[in-house]
Amino acid sequence: MASSRAQWFNPIAFTPWPVTCITTIVYLALLIPILVINLVVPSAPETNPKGVNLTEAWRDLQHLTGGFHPYNSRRNDEVHEWLLSRINSIIRPTVEAGQPSSANDNLPEVFVFDDNRSNLTYSNGGVGKTSIVGVYFESTNIIVYIRGSEDGLENWWEHSNGKPKGKGGVLVNAHYDSVSTGYGATDDGIGVVSLLQLLRYFTTPGNNPRKGLVLLFNNGEEDYLNGAHPPEADTTQAQDDTRHTNIDSLWHMLSASIGTTEGLVSYTGMDFDGKSKDQNKVNSGTGTLGVWFDMFGTAFAVFRLHTLFAISVALLVIAPLVIFVTSVILSKTDRMYLFSMSKSLEGTGDQVSLRGLRGFSRTPIILVIATTIPICLAYLLEKVNPYIVHSSQFSVWSMMFSAWIFLAWFLACAADFFRPSALHRAYSYTWIFIATWIMLVINTVYANQKGIAAGPSTAEFPGAAGEDTDPTESTSLLRGQRTTFANYRSSRPGGAAETDEREDINKGGTFEHEQSWSWTLPRWTWVLQLLLLAPIVLILVGQLALFLTASMCQVGSDGVSTFVVYLACSVFTTLLCIPLFPLIHRFTYHIPTFLFLVFIGTLIYNLVAFPFSPANRLKTFFIQEVDLDNGSNTVSLTGIQPYLTDAINSIPSAAGQNITCDKTTPFGKLERCSWSGLSPNVLGQGRERDNEIDPDKWITYNITKTVGKNKARIEISGRNTRACKLKFDRAVANFQVSGSAVDHRMPPTSRQGVSEIRLWSRTWENTWVVDINWHESADKSDDDDDDHDDENHDAPQNILSGKAICMWSDGNQPGVIPALDEVRLYAPSWIAISKAADGLVEASHSFTIQ
């Protein structure tokens, strides 16, 4: 009786209360820090680190985000001049290039390049037979070069054929333009002020870079040129300002930038030196594929992909061998119970029932059922309230997590009640090992063939070894100190019912109705198994799951199916709960019952709650199109229904109009609704000389066709803008902009042709001269022998039609785009306005070349 009482009060025994309490503590101890790391930004230091001025950085961010500053805005020019002024004020104490001073001998040379000369013509490359989009862009980038101690002292850029000498340098880049509907605090204002602080840091005595450092302030990133598409809605809206961020967020990025850049400029290895594999790229070495993961926000574990491949191959071979050898040893020492139905008694031939297969199949069955429920919940949310994850991602997580745990606990307890088995845990780890080994095989193949490192990279789970270990080398699993089956009580030949009395078994230390021999098993190994498996899964999978939902929870407003998000949540729920499953049948009813109530509450909330709020707004896309030929003025909002209609109904100018909606947008579930809106004043308020200009004079264009050839020259210019484009009803074969530079690494067109040419200039009201040529229509063809006449065959096949369009993107001044002002004023608070295209207003003239 004494031993039974001692076992009962064992704080790490494999009994309900220790299992419930310890498992809960372990999970909370791991999940809470992961949540805090992902949700709470580290505090900025109270005092400025050496070479950094946080107060100055915050003031810079406030100034930068004082207005919308897209490339096609006057405010963008102001930001450009302000950046030059800030850069010069920072480097003023340093040595001027070519004028060394004895007082500043320990400071690096700094060179500032205001790029107002370069331009580039390129295209998006096209897909299949789809026509591509060509772009002509004139740079207004700012380049700051900090000479490294290993760099050559020659100003090689001053020579026409000059080339840099020494080892490779480091490039850090940020764009200083914003979208036309956002102030650009996070996209990419924090990046810009981080570059300014990097400049201050590396021009501070004692922080000189070993390698040359180039800080690139680029312009025009938001307007197609680099195609940034942020995962969060607010980065393209008016909430992307300093009111909705803080100095802690600024320090978070700045500290990472300083640490990373300092490591790069101080690197002494040769990995980034030498010729590149691609001759069209800068000679920066061949590099290697890397693998890394975060350790509680304090450090990165970094190693090469081939190292992961080698470890994976070793685990694939060693892990099964270890399991096999362990199984052989257990069998040889008469201690192997897994997969054993019975044992023969020595000398009698009678069979002793061991019930060794009991519990073998319950693990995959229960896991499949428990995993199916979150998938069904994902489908239910997609059908009933698909956008609830937009604002309530943790409610979705709570629903799926609680549903999985309760159902798995209920099924495991039911199976354990009807068919109790001491080997439930051993078989669970065995199945987990098999599944992990298979996933590791897949991961290893992808790492080797595709260069992809994803999925499980370990194959632990020793399976039966921990479960079947006996306290001593001489003690049998079956009973007492016997080493053979010779003295065991025999059973009936056909069967297998044990005749031990339950009272004796309980006194011997078995748990309820499990096999009588189980009292000899160690009671503490489950703690080691939990501590081995849970941290690995929760640290790696937990952070990945939170990152995934944070980046994808608002993709529904972009027209992407949210079922992908819910399905990912359901899969990650299973992965996060896997360490619990071998132990879950020992849980008391308290936590599963509580989680069942959580499931009911979150399910109801997720099905009926309104998915958007002022803090988590629905993104809609605005554009106003003016046809200068017929004077029509169309305002369009693109978004998801029925919320888009609710927003439009609140706009006064749309009241009483016939709102037309269609699904012709390329954005999946999005609809575009249009109505006749307020007329824009794109020439600007207060420009008296332009007030009387008719809208049809906003754009001037001229077309000159080469006689007898499918060639033409188009001249186009717009008032108060520096962005226009040409759209063609069918693709042109080639184009060239007067004065443009072509880089063979980025061809302006391909055999598919160009259906649209976008033109960007650093000069306001610039006139672009574009030469185009096109092929005859492919329609004339194979139907010439048809009996019926098609009048289209008689039409000239070398006609080219299209539109000359100019764009206006400056929404800083009220009254310039009244339709946009109206939408911002009257749309519900849970609606956010973003741009639908490069311009907020697009005016067009149609043309035909024949």
Swiss-Prot record:
Q: What are the record's GO terms for cellular component?
A: vacuolar membrane
Topology relative to the membrane, per the entry? Answer: Multi-pass membrane protein
Gene Ontology BP terms: proteolysis
Q: What does this protein do?
A: May be involved in vacuolar sorting and osmoregulation.
Annotated GO MF terms? metal ion binding; metalloexopeptidase activity
SUPFAM superfamilies the UniProt entry points to: Zn-dependent exopeptidases
Textual note on the cofactor: Binds 2 Zn(2+) ions per subunit.
Identify the enzyme class. Answer: hydrolase
Cofactor(s) annotated in UniProt: Zn(2+)
Vacuolar side of the membrane: what ranges? Answer: 42-282, 330-363, 415-425, 551-563, 612-850
User: From which residue to which does any coiled coil extend?
Assistant: none
Q: Which residues are glycosylated?
A: 53, 116, 119, 630, 658, 702
What family classification does the UniProt entry report for this protein? Belongs to the peptidase M28 family.
Q: Which residues lie on this side of the membrane: Cytoplasmic?
A: 1-20, 304-308, 385-393, 447-529, 585-590
**Which domain of life does the protein's organism represent?**
Eukaryota
Which residues are recorded as binding Zn(2+) 2?
187, 222
Alphabetical UniProt keywords? Glycoprotein, Hydrolase, Membrane, Metal-binding, Metalloprotease, Protease, Transmembrane, Transmembrane helix, Vacuole, Zinc
The listed locations are:
Vacuole membrane
Q: What is its EC number?
A: 3.4.-.-
Residues that bind Zn(2+) 1, according to the entry? 175, 187
Which residue positions are annotated as catalytic?
221 (proton acceptor)
Looking up Pfam families in the UniProt record yields: Peptidase_M28, PFF1_C, PFF1_TM
Q: What is the protein name given in its UniProt record?
A: Vacuolar membrane protease
Q: Which residues cross the membrane?
A: 21-41, 283-303, 309-329, 364-384, 394-414, 426-446, 530-550, 564-584, 591-611
Q: Which InterPro entries match?
A: M28_fam, Peptidase_M28, PFF1_C, PFF1_TM
